[in-house]
């Protein structure tokens, strides 16, 4: 290792813990910040995140603390792994301790509850002058700490940030690819949570492989259509942060959003499901935000509209599914159709 860095990871959830552990294994000085002092002390002593990643021993050199100043001061890299509803508040709190040259990376896959603001846009607003990046991809935290081979994407306008993150996280089991389409990478991570709910619901209702394949590919088409109108590169959605994350999240019960959909398909109430989940499922809030924005832009997103009708308008799942099958039959691969 050429240079030993100080790195802060803000957020004691499963993904923040997994990323911090990789960095500690790579012999950097890393602090994992948890809001709860009790949880931080227990995790530091047990060398285990008993709440979100029970059963997995953390590296002995990983420092776990509830002292935000201690974690952030002097850090060259700061990863923010905070749910969207409290992301801005934590960034504002950390701002006073950031070094002027610190590079800040969001790992959150959501949209701020009020207004269509992505997490890296919050970083830009709250931390002017800092290099900003997004880390996203098909990355279940449990499989990362199990040292399953995993690929992720770091997206930024800054080549220096991209290079630094790649070097800091690279290991024999974790590979980081580069992308300059930060907006597209971040949208992919947020949008796929909606479709994970849909696919989980379909699985609970006994959907066959044909149905699952159709849902996945039409989900990808909707994501690309929406993102292109929002200014992202639709080709980004053919990579790890797009179709890769979509496949992972829509086919596994390790996904919180998939589990929400599965429970909905079993007839359970949304409020009960969210209360019993124990962790944040970003897809429910993202659905509200994307439905509103799609209506404003006039984007054709039948799957988003259908799920919204089920969750918030009291429509029956079978009624919505039947309507979707009788809807507009459009082109299959739209970004190819539109090329001159």
Curated annotation (Swiss-Prot):
Binding site for sn-glycerol 3-phosphate: 109, 137, 192, 245, 255-257
BP GO annotations: carbohydrate metabolic process; glycerol-3-phosphate biosynthetic process; glycerol-3-phosphate catabolic process; glycerophospholipid biosynthetic process
Subcellular location, record wording: Cytoplasm
EC number: 1.1.1.94
UniProt: NADPH binding residues: 14-15, 35, 109, 141, 256, 280, 282
Transmembrane segments: none
Alphabetical list of Gene3D superfamilies matching this protein: N-(1-d-carboxylethyl)-l-norvaline Dehydrogenase, domain 2 (1.10.1040.10), NAD(P)-binding Rossmann-like Domain (3.40.50.720)
PROSITE patterns hit by this protein: NAD_G3PDH (PS00957)
The protein's annotated pathway: Membrane lipid metabolism; glycerophospholipid metabolism
Keywords: Cytoplasm, Lipid biosynthesis, Lipid metabolism, NAD, NADP, Nucleotide-binding, Oxidoreductase, Phospholipid biosynthesis, Phospholipid metabolism
Name of the protein in its database record: Glycerol-3-phosphate dehydrogenase [NAD(P)+]
Subcellular location, principal: cytoplasm
UniProt similarity note: Belongs to the NAD-dependent glycerol-3-phosphate dehydrogenase family.
Family matches, as InterPro entries: 6-PGluconate_DH-like_C_sf (IPR008927), 6PGD_dom2 (IPR013328), G3P_DH_NAD-dep (IPR006168), G3P_DH_NAD-dep_C (IPR006109), G3P_DH_NAD-dep_N (IPR011128), NAD(P)-bd_dom_sf (IPR036291)
Functional note: Catalyzes the reduction of the glycolytic intermediate dihydroxyacetone phosphate (DHAP) to sn-glycerol 3-phosphate (G3P), the key precursor for phospholipid synthesis.
Active site per the UniProt annotation: 192 (proton acceptor)
Organism field: Cellvibrio japonicus (strain Ueda107) (Pseudomonas fluorescens subsp. cellulosa)
Pfam families reported in the protein's UniProt record: NAD_Gly3P_dh_C, NAD_Gly3P_dh_N
